[in-house]
Structure formats: C-alpha cells, structure tokens
Amino acid sequence: MAKNVVVIGAQWGDEGKGKIVDWLAEEAGGVVRFQGGHNAGHTLVVGGKKTILRLIPSGILHESLDCFIGSGVVVSPEALLGEIDELNAAGVKNVEGRLKIAPTCPLILPYHIALDQAREASRGKGKIGTTGRGIGPAYEDKVARRAIRAADLLHPEKLREKLDAVLAYYNVQLQHLHNAEPVKAEDVMAVIEKVAPRIAPMITDVSRVLNEKNKNGEKLLFEGAQGALLDIDYGTYPFVTSSNCLAGAASAGAGVGPQMLDYVLGIVKAYTTRVGSGPFPTELFDEVGAGLAERGHEFGSVTGRARRCGWFDAAALKRSIQINGISGMCITKLDVMDGVETINICVGYELPDGGKTDILPCGSDAVETCKPIYETMEGWKESTFGIKNYEELPDNAKAYLKRIEEVCGAPVAIVSTGPDREETIVLHHPFA
C-alpha cells in the first residue's frame, strides 16, 4: 500500500493550500477534493503564471495526473464547467478526460443561490458572511435527503420529478419568508440540460477508483478546503462553513477507509487571517495589521473580500492540531513577516472568570470573550523571500519557527517563502 497525505487548512482558511497541493502532486497518482464547494479559491503560481481553482483539485496542472471530486463536495455544474473552460483556454491538456466526479455529489442549482442570497440579505447586521454561492442550502438538502445529485443528470425524467418537489419547498421560503422572486422549474431545467452532456462523462465511482489506485501502490493526495477553525462542528459556530473541514472528513468525503490516511499536513500562515464575521482574538487594527494585509495581498481570490489580519495564534492552532491529528505543519507566507520589528505570538487566553487556557475554546460565544496572552519575540529585517534552504533563513526567523513548534506541539515540515511552487523549504517530505 502506498503512503497517502491529507492537506488541510489549520486556521480560518486562506492559508495557501493550493500551492502546497500543487507541489506535492508531483509525487501523487491522484488528487482528491473531499469537501466544500466553489466558495473559496486555491491560488497556484507556476513559473510566475497564476491560476485560481475553486472546485477542481489543485493537481490538475500536472498534465498526466487524475483528479477527483468526492461525494463530500457540493458541485455547481456551471462553476465547474466555467473553471474547465478557463483551464482549457490556458492550455492545460485533457482536463475533462482526467477529472472524475462522484455520482453522489450534491449539485448546487439556481434555487440554492437564490435562497442563500435572500437569507443573507434578510439578516441585516446579523450576517454570517456567506459567499452567497449556494453552498449552505446545498448541504442542507443533502442532510434533509432532498438533494439532486450528479447521478441524477443521467436520468432527466426522474430528475424533473425531484426538482418539482424541491422547488415547492424553496419557493415557499423565497416568497413568504424573504419576499423574493420564486425560481421556475423551466429555468433550472434549462441549466441542467445545458450542463448535463459535458458533466455526465466525468461521473465515476470515485471511491472504487481511489481504493484501486491505492491497492496498486499509487500515492493519493487529499485536498481540503477552507480551514479547521471554520469546521461546522469544531469551528467558531455559527461563523463557520457548512461542511466538515477536518482531516477525518477525507475518509467519508472521498470514500476511503481511515486507515488510508497516513500523514496529515496542516497548512499554517505565519500570521493569522480571517474573512467575514466571527471572533478573532489576535486581530490587529493598527499599522502592523495593515502592513501584513498589504504585503500578503490579503484579499479573497474568489470573493475579493479583504481579510482581517492578526498575530500568530498558537492557542487556536493547538486546537486544530488536536482535532486533525496533524503530523506536520507547513508554514506559509513567512516572507510577509520580513521587517516586522517586534512579533507577538498568542500562547493562551485570559477568560472572563480570571482563569487562563492554552487552547481555543469551542464556539464563537466562548471565543468572543477570550483576551490573548502574548509572548514577544524580535523580528528580522533580512528578506526571506524565495529562500529554499533552511540554514539560509535569518536566525530570528528560525527562532520564530522553533517557538511555534514548541508552543503548538507539532513539527514544522515545510516552509513556504513565496507564491511560486519552487519557493519552498522542505524539512520533512510528507510522502517520505
């Protein structure tokens, strides 16, 4: 049996997973997305050329590599085909021939988007920060057992029956709860009839293929989306996404046994960011935070939304390491910290009752009341951009990485010093 690696975001998303998955994909026989939708982008830079992927696994740029979308992913057919067309236009070869979609993937259709946006508009100041792309309602349908799934595209007559029943449910909410326009079945069917001929050939028993590949000695790479602190169960609920973002979700979301998950690589930014609403104990509102945002280009690759920036939160990461079983960390954007004179690391929190904790509490209400406890370290003036050898890093940068290891309790396996695939320091290869 080959060794397999799960890559997950260990913070609130946007940690730089795409680059690392693309880099690791050189040694993989297949790359699998196992949860999430097209609500977050994975940015890859190869030879200075930028590619943003939302649904398609980040291994697709390796032109002999098979890529898979597992049943834990909610798929927008229109977004998927748009992404395929972008890759085709960029000269990536045989995308549709190498991309396989599980028949059990729930589809995101126009009524999901309509309800998602209507709900967020109705919340007023209580917005939870949804991207409005229908992700949440699609997951609701999955759990409520009314989802239209990829396999339904193969049976249009039965699909129409399911659609009529689903729209009866959705249109009541749209019209009577949110004062919004109803969605017409004919409009949804027009979308389905347009996308089905292209998507149908990609529908494959992903679970079976992955298990066969592993049995034949091929390495598999499981690619997570969002971040562990946005997990529906363990994140800062309700300011979370609608899926399980943890490493363990790779098993159910891809259709493989947990014994096939050999190494968990947690992607960790050298500082902390968060998009949208929700508690953020180490958030900075000063020039340091603004500088991190500017140097780190902290804007969402899909949404364009500005990211909130703060000091490294080791107490939050400790929770992530615990719930994911992280084997090693990849520290990204170390170069963004260049020139920060004094660096703070959050090592715990003061609680309202006067107590202290060294790990992130569960749920947003508890996190909202936390006051960060900081350790202070000297920064470094030298540039770390593009460094590929650990020994060439400034002493203070190495001390920073070492302290992160000590406080969090997990080793640093990889350090990313720039956006390009090659701008990477390897201390321990996850596939080794």
Curated annotation (Swiss-Prot):
**EC number(s) on file:** 6.3.4.4
Binding of substrate: at which residues? 301-307
Read off the InterPro entries from this record: Adenylosuccin_syn_GTP-bd, Adenylosuccin_syn_Lys_AS, Adenylosuccinate_synth_dom1, Adenylosuccinate_synth_dom2, Adenylosuccinate_synth_dom3, Adenylosuccinate_synthetase, P-loop_NTPase
What Gene Ontology molecular-function terms does this entry list? adenylosuccinate synthase activity; GTP binding; magnesium ion binding
Cellular location(s): Cytoplasm
Q: How is the cofactor bound?
A: Binds 1 Mg(2+) ion per subunit.
- Give me the residues that bind GTP, please: 13-19, 41-43, 307, 333-335, 416-418
Catalytic activity from the UniProt record: IMP + L-aspartate + GTP = N(6)-(1,2-dicarboxyethyl)-AMP + GDP + phosphate + 2 H(+)
Q: Where does Mg(2+) bind?
A: 14, 41
GO BP annotations, alphabetical order = 'de novo' AMP biosynthetic process; IMP metabolic process
Q: In which pathway does it act?
A: Purine metabolism; AMP biosynthesis via de novo pathway; AMP from IMP: step 1/2
* Top-level enzyme category: ligase
Where exactly are the transmembrane stretches of this chain? none
Q: Which Gene3D superfamilies match?
A: Adenylosuccinate Synthetase, subunit A, domain 1, Adenylosuccinate Synthetase, subunit A, domain 2, Adenylosuccinate Synthetase, subunit A, domain 3
Kindly state which keywords UniProt assigns to this record, in alphabetical order: Cytoplasm, GTP-binding, Ligase, Magnesium, Metal-binding, Nucleotide-binding, Purine biosynthesis
GO CC field: cytoplasm
Quote the subunit structure annotation: Homodimer.
HAMAP family hit by this protein: Adenylosucc_synth
Protein's UniProt name: Adenylosuccinate synthetase
Q: Which organism is it from?
A: Neisseria meningitidis serogroup C (strain 053442)
Source gene?
A: purA
